[in-house]
């Protein structure tokens, strides 16, 4: 095995181990924020959604800056410092008893994510061959699902048996371990293959108008995805009346991922373009969300959640691969960072807007309101994507170094 192939293989295993700590730490805390503050403490869904949206907006909105620094300084210092910063954010969240403290914790967690997220994503693109990206993203999705179950089960148990403070401290410990692991084992990889200055990397992205429009359009996709952390857990708790039942959302995701993600991804790679897979998955997600406000049966809710995850299984590997192949190796992290802007906008609107619509629907006794609004947003997103792919010649190209 030549040295380059060996580096790629070892790098792949490193990414999988690192991802395990990060995902478990994330899911041990974030899905329970809405439950703790809305259901247990009685805060409004809008207020909690605003804090979650603020975290999303800062982390992903500043992604292009974090990515540009990673292009210039390398992956390791950005990833390690970002993981430690999120550790501190979770410690502060364990002390949050006012909206101000919650927002401060979310901001610090977001800044940590701004530092570690773009270079981690760029490492995947650097270490995995372009034609293998789709399958590797499928493996990561499968791992995400399994680790999400571990995280949410751990967090739910700690919340039931002890308190939210211990939930946050457990998440902090996991991110601290991830930071130490990266400091110890992550080589000093250079992500970018050119010597562009910080501003030149950002300018290169901003001159690619088609990439910018595509990125902004994906905000609609993330508005729907954000509900996994906000309204789906709340709806599950409303119908079941049991805090412990929230984990079934993520158990459903894990089971479907184990059974379907590899065969669906392999089969769709043979017969469908990336663009078609992205739009088809989004349509399935829309169909699943539409009736959620009307169901009052736990089994019906789980069926709709299952359909939502099937749509995600179809769309997400295609979206990740398409976004990766639209980047330029000369400013890889800058492209990845800017692409996170769609997650920033979509997450902010999905959390704060979803929380506001939930409160409004409850006030008007019209519980279907947020779900109908989500369906409309998703439909508009599909139509805009179709127009771009059909008429604006947005096509992936296999940039490589």
Curated annotation (Swiss-Prot):
The chain crosses the membrane at residues 13-33, 34-54, 88-108, 139-159, 164-184, 211-231, 248-268, 275-295, 298-318, 341-361, 366-386. It is a multi-pass membrane protein. The keyword Transport applies. InterPro entries: MFS, MFS_dom, MFS_trans_sf, MFS_Transporters, Multidrug-R_MdtH. It comes from the Bacteria. SUPFAM superfamilies: MFS general substrate transporter (SSF103473). CDD domains: MFS_MdtH_MDR_like. It is found in: Cell inner membrane. GO terms for molecular function: transmembrane transporter activity. Pfam families: MFS_1 (PF07690). Its main location: membrane. Keywords: Cell inner membrane, Cell membrane, Membrane, Transmembrane, Transmembrane helix, Transport. The keyword NADP does not apply. GO terms for cellular component: plasma membrane. HAMAP family: MFS_MdtH. Belongs to the major facilitator superfamily. DHA1 family. MdtH (TC 2.A.1.2.21) subfamily. This is Multidrug resistance protein MdtH. It comes from Blochmanniella floridana. The lineage of its organism: Bacteria, Pseudomonadati, Pseudomonadota, Gammaproteobacteria, Enterobacterales. The gene is mdtH.
């Amino acid at each position: 095995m030549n040295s380059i192939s060996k580096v790629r293989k070892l790098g792949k295993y490193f990414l999988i181990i690192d991802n395990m700590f990060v995902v478990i730490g994330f899911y041990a805390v974030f899905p329970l924020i809405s439950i703790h503050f809305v259901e247990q403490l009685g805060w409004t869904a809008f207020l909690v959604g605003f804090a979650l949206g603020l975290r999303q907006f800062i982390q992903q909105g500043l992604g292009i800056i974090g990515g540009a620094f990673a292009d210039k300084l390398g992956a390791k210092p950005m990833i390690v410092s970002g993981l430690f910063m999120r550790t501190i954010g979770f410690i502060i969240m364990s002390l949050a008893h006012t909206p101000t403290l919650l927002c401060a914790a979310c901001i610090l967690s977001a800044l940590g994510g701004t530092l570690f997220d773009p270079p981690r994503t760029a490492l995947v693109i650097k270490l995995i061959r372009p034609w293998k990206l789709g399958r590797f993203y499928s493996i990561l999705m499968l791992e995400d699902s399994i680790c999400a179950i571990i995280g949410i089960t751990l967090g739910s148990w700690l919340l039931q048996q002890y308190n939210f403070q211990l939930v946050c401290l457990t998440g902090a410990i996991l991110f601290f371990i991830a930071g130490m692991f990266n400091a110890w084992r992550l080589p000093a990889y250079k992500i970018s293959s050119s010597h562009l200055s910080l501003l030149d990397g950002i300018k290169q992205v901003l001159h690619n108008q088609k990439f910018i429009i595509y990125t902004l359009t994906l905000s609609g996709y993330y508005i729907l995805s954000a509900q996994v952390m906000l309204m789906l857990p709340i709806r599950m708790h409303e119908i079941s009346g049991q805090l412990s039942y929230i984990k079934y959302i993520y158990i459903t995701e894990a089971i479907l991922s184990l059974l379907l993600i590899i065969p669906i991804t392999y089969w769709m790679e043979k017969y469908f373009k990336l663009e078609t897979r992205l739009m088809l998955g989004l349509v399935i997600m829309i169909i699943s969300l539409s009736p959620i406000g009307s169901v009052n049966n736990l089994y019906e809710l789980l069926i709709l959640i299952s359909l939502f995850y099937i749509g995600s299984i179809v769309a997400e590997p295609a979206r990740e691969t398409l976004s990766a192949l639209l980047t330029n190796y000369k400013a890889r992290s800058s492209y990845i960072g800017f692409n996170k802007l769609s997650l920033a906008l979509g997450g902010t609107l999905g959390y704060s807007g979803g929380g506001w619509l939930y409160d409004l629907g409850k006030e008007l006794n019209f519980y279907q309101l947020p779900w109908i609004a989500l369906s409309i947003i998703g439909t508009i997103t599909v139509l805009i994507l179709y127009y771009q792919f059909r008429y604006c010649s947005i096509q992936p190209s296999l940039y490589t170094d």
